């Protein structure tokens, strides 16, 4: 049977998992899945359609019909590039609120699993190792202090020309952490066999090197 390796990288908002996942995928030549972008796309599409966050059926319908295309550092929704639009803090907060609904998560499950193709996949999100790819040979739970994450998110937004307030970001991250960890549908938590990686005082390259070292030790097709 053909082995399609998956490196699952989970963690809270602004923990650095997206950047680490991107660099790991480049290093090993695997495809990349940014699962958080899918929830942000549902958030953007539903916001544009004027759908209330409490209308779970309508949100799930949008998720099941998501017309999305990914490219290097770019994403398209129904043919429109929305790479910057989905990174707005308001859309991120809306995505976090949408992600608590099981019907939405169910609608996106098969779409996420369809990204598993040769030569392999690096998947980053919040439930990659616990729900979407529980058989991944390497599961990493990447985290950092909320203060470090707020500073990173602030820099990301400013670098993209998006105005931000670090105190507001800190409050938003704390609220999102509570929501992600306490939701009934796939709460944010490490898989039982996940490697824990605290990046509060690490550079991106150090975190990437650690993930690559772990993968080299467990890679079944090596």
UniProtKB/Swiss-Prot annotation:
Listed under GO cellular component are: cytosol
Q: What is its main location?
A: cytoplasm
Q: Which InterPro entries match?
A: Cytidylate_kin, Cytidylate_kinase_dom, P-loop_NTPase
Q: Which GO terms describe its molecular function?
A: ATP binding; CMP kinase activity; dCMP kinase activity
Q: Which GO terms describe its biological process?
A: nucleobase-containing small molecule interconversion; pyrimidine nucleotide metabolic process
Transferase: present as a keyword of the record? yes
Q: Which UniProt keywords apply?
A: ATP-binding, Cytoplasm, Kinase, Nucleotide-binding, Transferase
Q: Which CDD domains match?
A: CMPK
Specify which residues bind ATP according to the UniProt entry for this protein.
Answer: 11-19
Superkingdom per UniProt: Bacteria
Q: What is its EC number?
A: 2.7.4.25
Q: Which Pfam families match?
A: Cytidylate_kin
Where it sits in the cell: the answer is: Cytoplasm
**Broad class of enzyme this protein falls into:** transferase
Q: Which reaction does it catalyse?
A: CMP + ATP = CDP + ADP; dCMP + ATP = dCDP + ADP
Q: Which family does it belong to?
A: Belongs to the cytidylate kinase family. Type 1 subfamily.
Q: Which HAMAP family does UniProt cross-reference here? A: Cytidyl_kinase_type1 (MF_00238)
Entry protein name: Cytidylate kinase
Organism encoding this protein: Cupriavidus necator (strain ATCC 17699 / DSM 428 / KCTC 22496 / NCIMB 10442 / H16 / Stanier 337) (Ralstonia eutropha)
Upper lineage is: Bacteria, Pseudomonadati, Pseudomonadota, Betaproteobacteria, Burkholderiales
């Amino acid at each position: 049977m053909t082995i399609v390796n998956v490196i699952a990288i989970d963690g809270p908002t602004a923990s650095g998992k997206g950047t680490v996942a991107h660099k790991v995928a480049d290093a090993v030549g695997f495809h990349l899945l940014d699962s958080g972008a899918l929830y942000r796309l549902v958030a953007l599409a539903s916001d544009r359609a004027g759908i209330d966050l409490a209308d779970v059926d309508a949100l799930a319908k949008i998720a099941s019909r998501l017309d999305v295309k990914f490219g290097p550092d770019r994403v398209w929704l129904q043919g429109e590039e929305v790479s910057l639009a989905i990174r707005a803090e308001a859309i991120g907060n809306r995505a976090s609120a949408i992600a608590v609904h099981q019907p939405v998560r169910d609608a996106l499950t098969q779409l996420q699993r369809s990204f598993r193709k040769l030569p392999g996949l690096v998947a980053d999100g919040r439930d990659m190792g616990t729900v979407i790819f529980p058989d991944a040979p390497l599961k990493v739970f990447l985290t950092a202090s909320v203060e470090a994450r707020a500073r990173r998110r602030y820099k990301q937004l400013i670098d993209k020309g998006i105005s931000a307030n670090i105190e507001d970001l800190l409050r938003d991250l704390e609220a999102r952490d509570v929501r992600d960890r306490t939701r009934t549908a796939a709460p944010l938590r490490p898989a039982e066999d996940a490697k824990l990686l605290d990046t509060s005082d690490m550079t991106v390259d150090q975190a990437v090197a650690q993930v690559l070292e772990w993968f080299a030790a467990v890679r079944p097709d090596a």
